[in-house]
Amino acid sequence: MEKISSKEKIIFELRKRKKDVYFWAISLSIVLIILIFICTKENSLYFVLSSMAQTLSFIIIILRVTQNQSCSEISINYLICFIIMLVSRLITNIFSSYDIEISLINSIFLYLSQIISLLICFYLLYLIYFVYPETSDKMFDNKLPFYYILIPTFILAIFFKPYIFRNRIFDVLFVFSIILESVAIYPQIILFTTKKGEIETYTSNFIAFQGLSTVFILIFWYKNYAFVNDRKSLLLGGFAGYAIIVSELFQLIFMGYYFYLYFKSIMKRKKIKKFDL
């Protein structure tokens, strides 16, 4: 019997724990990014980190889809909501300007992360509908259709519209994208609660990074909520910043029990059972 070298043992263990290696490599990347950007001391830093955490979450899920050749556990309604949110945000960022200070390097990382996330979402929809349609969970992804989220969110955006771009369309799109971002994840969480079985490691990490993104964006708006409050508004524009913070807090509360199960599963090295949710 041949003796296995230490190098071969290490390679074997790394291959065996490939999912964990991916996860911690991405986590380390986030830590390094934070250390690089923290010296800027800009409020926009948290907005950029939130966007990058979202991008990393989509990179995780695309790795899972390509490796398993399966689109199960991915909510189509969530992807549609997220695409519309990103398009709305990119429109307001590209064709208008506001007074929040942001450096050139932060702007580059912000736009780059948003564009990458958008492309991955479109690619995921392509895989779901044309490459692996038989693996999707369309039967379980019908509890909260995307238009149930988009319509109320757009109405709220009209009422809470601030006056920061001096253009009604951009003002509405700006608030619409922020509120939509805080509620877009709901179809994905509901899909987990509807389908029985275990949540895969990749999918668990995907939601974890989405939660990290929410924490960063909540910190950002806590520091900048007064910026979007329009005291001259005839509707509810004077409370726009408060509405944003409440929506982000509500999302964290909604996802709180999931995070409890997520960290519990990491400690015990077990997958999350969907009947626990």
What feature does the model see in each segment?
Residues 1-277:
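Alpha-helical membrane-protein topology signature
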